From Swiss-Prot:
This is Ubiquitin carboxyl-terminal hydrolase 10. Phosphorylated by ATM following DNA damage, leading to stabilization and translocation it to the nucleus. Ubiquitinated. Deubiquitinated by USP13. Residues 139-166, 194-257, 307-337, 551-594 are annotated as: Disordered. Found in a deubiquitination complex with TANK, USP10 and ZC3H12A; this complex inhibits genotoxic stress- or interleukin-1-beta (IL1B)-mediated NF-kappa-B activation by promoting IKBKG or TRAF6 deubiquitination. Interacts with IKBKG; this interaction increases in response to DNA damage. Interacts with TANK; this interaction increases in response to DNA damage. Interacts with TRAF6; this interaction increases in response to DNA damage. Interacts with ZC3H12A; this interaction increases in response to DNA damage. Specifically inhibited by spautin-1 (specific and potent autophagy inhibitor-1), a derivative of MBCQ that binds to USP10 and inhibits deubiquitinase activity. Regulated by PIK3C3/VPS34-containing complexes. Residues 6-21 are annotated as: G3BP1-binding. Changing residue 13 to Y/V/L/I: Decreased but not abolished interaction with G3BP1. The lineage of its organism: Eukaryota, Metazoa, Chordata, Craniata, Vertebrata. It comes from Homo sapiens (Human).
Length: 798
C-alpha cells in the first residue's frame, strides 16, 4: 500500500449521514493492500470452518488485512458498499460490472439490501428456488446501477436503528417483524424493497439492515457458530404481528413459570405487557429483555434450548447496538449471551448443536397463566387483607402463642437513621425500641417474609418492625478502650451505615393515623402509643385465629381506654359482669370494674395496670383497673422537681366538688390512682406540653431530675399488691431517654440517648449521627434539650 494507496470518493452525503456512518464503528471499511489489481467487494470461500456457508468480512478503515497468496483473483467480484449503496464508484478503479446471476455463485453474491449473502441470509427453508428469486430480484452487482438510475435514495444499513435516538426522519415506535418495519409506515421500506418482499414466498423471512448481524441484541451474534434454525412454517406469526399469534398475547404470557426457570429481566422502565390489535405499542414488547429459559417451550411460543458452556469467538469484534425501545434497558447487569428483543430471536443462520436454538410454534395455543406476575400486578394485590385471607397469619399466630420473652441484653452495632423529612420523632422512638432487648428478641423471633413470599399481609406493622430489627446485627468486634486525658477511658465505636426506614414511615398512612395529617404537631409519645397499640391489635387479631372466643373480649381491651366514664359505670350497676366486690385492708369492701384483658407479647413487655378508686360518702368504694403502655406524669406543679415527685403526685388523693348523683344531691367524692401491676419495661412520659383554655399549647421548659436507678416505693402500689412485690420487682434501670429540643410546643427536634451493652456505655443518636457519651451527660440538665420519655427496665430481668 506504500506505492499506490487507494483513494476514497465518498459521494454526496448529508451531515447526519456523515456523522452516523463515518464517526461510528459501522462506517469503517477495510481493504486489502494494493497488488497490481484492485480487489473490491467480498470473497467467496468454498470450505469454511464449522460448516458455515459464508465468511464474515469485517470492515474498518483503521485496520489493514495482510496480503494472502491464496486470494483468488477472479473477475466475479461485485462491489457492495456498506457506506452508500448508490455509489458503485466508491473506490477508485472499481467499476460496477454487470454480471448476470447465472455467472456467479450464490456464495459469491453480496446483496446490498440486507448487507449479507442472500444464500445464507434468506434461504431459511433451504429452497434453491427462493435463492434464485432473491438473486434475480436483487440483481447483485447490476442492481447497483439500476438504483443509481432510479435516483431514489436507499438508506444505508442500520439507518433506522440509529434514528431511534432522535431525528426528523425517525419513524414512530412500532413492532418489528424479524427486524422489518411495517411497509405502511413512511420511510420504512422503499418501493424496490416492497416489490422484492412481495415476490418472496411466505416461508421466507428476509433480514434487513435494521436487524444487524454484528449486534449484541442477537443471540446468533454472541455465539457466531451457533445461530437459530430458520425453518419457519407458513402459518407462523412473529412477535410483531398484531393478532392471532403468541405475540398478540405477550402481555398475558410474557413471563414464564417461576419454578425451574430463570426470572425474566425487564427493562428499567418496564411497562405492563398488554395485548393489542395494533402494532403501535408492540415495540415495547419487542424491547423486553429476555433470558434463555432452562426448560422447553416458554409461554410466549418461543422454545429456547441452552447448553452448559458457550464458546465465544474472540476474533470477531462485538458492536453494541442502541436499545430497541426508548425506555432504555437495564442491560448492565445481564450476561452478554442474552437476546434483548423478540426480533433478535428470529435472526437466521445455520443451526448448531452448541448454541441456544429458538423455535417458533406453528400453532396458536392459549397462553398459560404464569404464577410469576409483573411488578405492577403485585402492587395491585398488595395491601391489607383480613387475617382469614392471609395464609401466613396462622403461622405467626402459632409462633406468638408459644413465644417466650427474652430479656437478655444483646450487643448490636448502632446505625443512624436518615431523616429526609420531619421524621425525627419517629427516628428517636425507633432507636429507643431497638435498644429494648425483649422488643428486639420478639421481632427477631418472627420470620421475615419477602414480598414474593407474602404479597398480601394482614399484619403490616408486625412485618415492618420485623424488617427493622433485621436491619441491626450483632457488634462484629468489641471495641478496644483507649487511654484519654487523665484516667478516663474512652471507647471507640464504629456504627454501621445509616439507612432510611421508609417502610416504617408508610405505616402512618397505611393505618390512617392522625399523625400523618399535615400541619399537625409530631409527638414522640403519641407515636410510641401508635406503635404499641398497633402491634397489640394485630396480635389480638392473630389470636382470634386460634381462639375465636377471644373476639368478643377485644372491644374494651388495650391501653387506649384510659378515661373512665363514671356515668356509664353507674348505669351498669353493681351487677355488671365486669365488676366484683373486693375486700381490702381493714375489711373494707370495694366494687372493682375491669376491662377484659387479653395478653399479647406487647403487653407482656410494656403493659401495666393502674387502679383508679373513687371514694363516696355512704357508698362502697368503686375501683377501676386500666391498662397502660406509658405512665403519664404531670409535672406542671411548681412542687414537682424530680421523677419521684411526679410519681407521688400521681397517686395523691384528689377531691372533686359539686358532683351530682341521680338523686340530684351534691356530694363530696375523691379519687386516687395507684399502681396495680408494674411492667417489665416502664416508660415514663413527662407531660411537657400543656394545653390552654384558649386552645393554644405551651411547653414546660423546667428541668426534671431523673435517676439512672429508679425504685418504686410501696406507697405507690395498690393495697392488694404492696406486700407481693419484692424490692427487685420495683427497681428499674434507665436504658433510653428521648429528648425534645426547642422552646416551642409546635416545633423542635427529637434525639435519643441509649445504653449500649457492648460498649457498656451510652450513645447519643441524632438521626444518622451516632457518638459516644458518658452517663453524666445523660442525666445532666441542659437548656437546649429536655427529657421527654424515660425508658426503664426491671433490674431483676437484666
Amino acid at each position: 500500500m506504500a506505492l499506490h494507496s487507494p483513494q476514497y470518493i465518498f459521494g454526496d452525503f448529508s451531515p447526519d449521514e456523515f456523522n452516523q456512518f463515518f464517526v461510528t464503528p459501522r462506517s469503517s471499511v477495510e481493504l486489502p493492500p494494493y497488488s497490481g489489481t484492485v480487489l473490491c467487494g467480498t470473497q467467496a470461500v468454498d470450505k469454511l470452518p464449522d460448516g458455515q456457508e459464508y465468511q464474515r468480512i469485517e470492515f474498518g478503515v483503521d485496520e489493514v488485512i495482510e496480503p494472502s497468496d491464496t486470494l483468488p483473483r477472479t473477475p466475479s467480484y461485485s462491489i457492495s458498499s456498506t457506506l452508500n449503496p448508490q455509489a458503485p464508484e466508491f473506490i477508485l478503479g472499481c467499476t460496477a460490472s454487470k454480471i448476470t446471476p447465472d455467472g456467479i455463485t450464490k456464495e459469491a453474491s453480496y446483496g446490498s439490501i440486507d448487507c449479507q449473502y442472500p444464500g445464507s441470509a434468506l434461504a431459511l427453508d433451504g429452497s434453491s428456488n427462493v435463492e434464485a428469486e432473491v438473486l434475480e430480484n436483487d440483481g447483485v452487482s447490476g442492481g447497483l446501477g439500476q438504483r443509481e438510475r432510479k435516483k431514489k435514495k436507499k438508506r444505508p444499513p442500520g439507518y433506522y436503528s440509529y434514528l431511534k435516538d432522535g431525528g426528523d426522519d425517525s419513524i414512530s415506535t412500532e413492532a418489528l417483524v424479524n427486524g422489518h418495519a411495517n411497509s405502511a409506515v413512511p420511510n420504512s421500506v422503499s418501493a424496490e424493497d416492497a416489490e422484492f418482499m412481495g415476490d418472496m414466498p411466505p416461508s421466507v423471512t428476509p433480514r434487513t439492515c435494521n436487524s444487524p448481524q454484528n449486534s449484541t441484541d442477537s443471540v446468533s451474534d454472541i455465539v457466531p457458530d451457533s445461530p437459530f434454525p430458520g425453518a419457519l412454517g407458513s402459518d407462523t406469526r412473529t412477535a410483531g404481528q398484531p393478532e392471532g399469534g403468541p405475540g398478540a398475547d405477550f402481555g398475558q404470557s410474557c413471563f414464564p413459570a417461576e419454578a425451574g426457570r430463570d426470572t425474566l429481566s425487564r427493562t428499567a422502565g418496564a411497562q405492563p405487557c398488554v395485548g393489542t390489535d395494533t402494532t403501535e405499542n408492540l415495540g415495547v414488547a419487542n424491547g423486553q429483555i429476555l433470558e434463555s429459559s432452562g426448560e422447553g417451550t416458554a409461554t410466549n411460543g418461543v422454545e429456547l434450548h441452552t447448553t452448559e458452556s458457550i464458546d465465544l469467538d474472540p476474533t470477531k469484534p462485538e458492536s453494541a447496538s442502541p436499545p430497541a425501545d426508548g425506555t432504555g434497558s437495564a442491560s448492565g447487569t445481564l450476561p452478554v449471551s442474552q437476546p434483548k428483543s423478540w426480533a433478535s430471536l428470529f435472526h437466521d443462520s445455520k443451526p448448531s448443536s452448541s448454541s441456544p436454538v429458538a423455535y417458533v410454534e406453528t400453532k396458536y395455543s392459549p397462553p398459560a397463566i404464569s404464577p410469576l406476575v409483573s411488578e405492577k400486578q403485585v402492587e395491585v394485590k398488595e395491601g391489607l387483607v383480613p387475617v382469614s385471607e392471609d395464609p401466613v397469619a396462622i403461622k405467626i399466630a402459632e409462633l406468638l402463642e408459644n413465644v417466650t420473652l427474652i430479656h437478655k441484653p444483646v450487643s448490636l452495632q448502632p446505625r443512624g437513621l436518615i431523616n429526609k423529612g420531619n421524621w425525627c420523632y419517629i427516628n428517636a422512638t425507633l432507636q429507643a425500641l431497638v435498644a429494648c432487648p425483649p422488643m428486639y428478641h420478639l421481632m427477631k423471633f418472627i420470620p421475615l417474609y419477602s414480598k414474593v413470599q407474602r404479597p398480601c399481609t394482614s399484619t403490616p406493622m408486625i412485618d415492618s418492625f420485623v424488617r427493622l430489627m433485621n436491619e441491626f446485627t450483632n457488634m462484629p468486634v468489641p471495641p478496644k478502650p483507649r487511654q484519654a486525658l487523665g484516667d478516663k477511658i474512652v471507647r471507640d465505636i464504629r456504627p454501621g451505615a445509616a439507612f432510611e426506614p421508609t417502610y416504617i414511615y408508610r405505616l402512618l398512612t397505611v393505618n390512617k393515623s392522625s399523625l400523618s395529617e399535615k400541619g399537625r404537631q409530631e409527638d414522640a409519645e403519641e407515636y410510641l402509643g401508635f406503635i404499641l397499640n398497633g402491634l397489640h391489635e394485630e396480635m389480638l387479631n392473630l389470636k382470634k385465629l386460634l381462639s375465636p372466643s377471644n373476639e368478643k373480649l377485644t372491644i374494651s381491651n388495650g391501653p387506649k381506654n384510659h378515661s373512665v366514664n363514671e356515668e356509664e359505670q353507674e348505669e351498669q350497676g353493681e351487677g355488671s359482669e365486669d365488676e366484683w366486690e373486693q375486700v381490702g385492708p381493714r375489711n373494707k369492701t370495694s366494687v372493682t370494674r375491669q376491662a377484659d384483658f387479653v395478653q399479647t407479647p406487647i403487653t407482656g413487655i410494656f403493659g401495666g395496670h393502674i387502679r383508679s378508686v373513687v371514694y363516696q360518702q355512704s357508698s362502697k368504694e368503686s375501683a377501676t383497673l386500666q391498662p397502660f403502655f406509658t405512665l403519664q406524669l404531670d409535672i406542671q406543679s411548681d412542687k414537682i422537681r424530680t421523677v419521684q415527685d411526679a410519681l407521688e403526685s400521681l397517686v395523691a388523693r384528689e377531691s372533686v366538688q359539686g358532683y351530682t348523683t341521680k338523686t340530684k344531691q351534691e356530694v363530696e367524692i375523691s379519687r386516687r390512682v395507684t399502681l396495680e401491676k408494674l411492667p417489665p419495661v416502664l416508660v415514663l412520659h413527662l407531660k411537657r406540653f400543656v394545653y390552654e383554655k384558649t386552645g393554644g399549647c405551651q411547653k414546660l421548659i423546667k428541668n426534671i431530675e431523673y435517676p439512672v436507678d429508679l425504685e418504686i416505693s410501696k406507697e405507690l402500689l395498690s393495697p392488694g399488691v404492696k406486700n407481693k412485690n419484692f424490692k427487685c420487682h420495683r427497681t428499674y434501670r434507665l436504658f433510653a431517654v428521648v429528648y425534645h429540643h426547642g422552646n416551642s410546643a409546635t416545633g423542635g427536634h427529637y434525639t435519643t440517648d441509649v445504653f449500649q451493652i457492648g460498649l457498656n456505655g451510652w450513645l447519643r443518636i441524632d438521626d444518622q449521627t451516632v457518638k459516644v457519651i458518658n452517663q453524666y451527660q445523660v442525666v445532666k440538665p441542659t437548656a437546649e434539650r429536655t427529657a421527654y420519655l424515660l425508658y426503664y427496665r426491671r433490674v431483676d430481668l437484666l
